[in-house]
UniProtKB/Swiss-Prot annotation:
The gene is rpl32. This is Large ribosomal subunit protein bL32c. Residues 1-20 have a biased composition (Basic residues). It is found in: Plastid, Chloroplast. It comes from Mesostigma viride. One of its GO terms (molecular function) is structural constituent of ribosome. Keywords: Chloroplast, Plastid, Ribonucleoprotein, Ribosomal protein. Residues 1-28 are annotated as: Disordered. It holds the Pfam family Ribosomal_L32p. Its main location: plastid. GO terms for biological process: translation. Belongs to the bacterial ribosomal protein bL32 family. GO terms for cellular component: chloroplast; large ribosomal subunit.
């Protein structure tokens, strides 16, 4: 029979949650920056401009 596990402490739970939120915020910031550069036409990523012009 399975034994009950110990409860995760609030501080550990909050640490993990804050790490996840920090990573999510960083990714959101990068995505917004890329979207702005694509919108202004200053993107240095290959194929982005050609893909946008094909769809328009």
């Amino acid at each position: 029979m399975a034994a009950p596990k110990k409860r995760t402490s609030k501080s550990r739970k909050n640490m993990r949650k804050s790490t996840w939120k920090r990573q999510a915020a960083t990714q959101a910031k990068k995505a917004l920056s890329l979207a702005k550069s694509i919108a202004t036409g200053k993107s240095t990523i290959r194929g982005v401009q050609s893909n946008l012009s094909d769809e328009s």
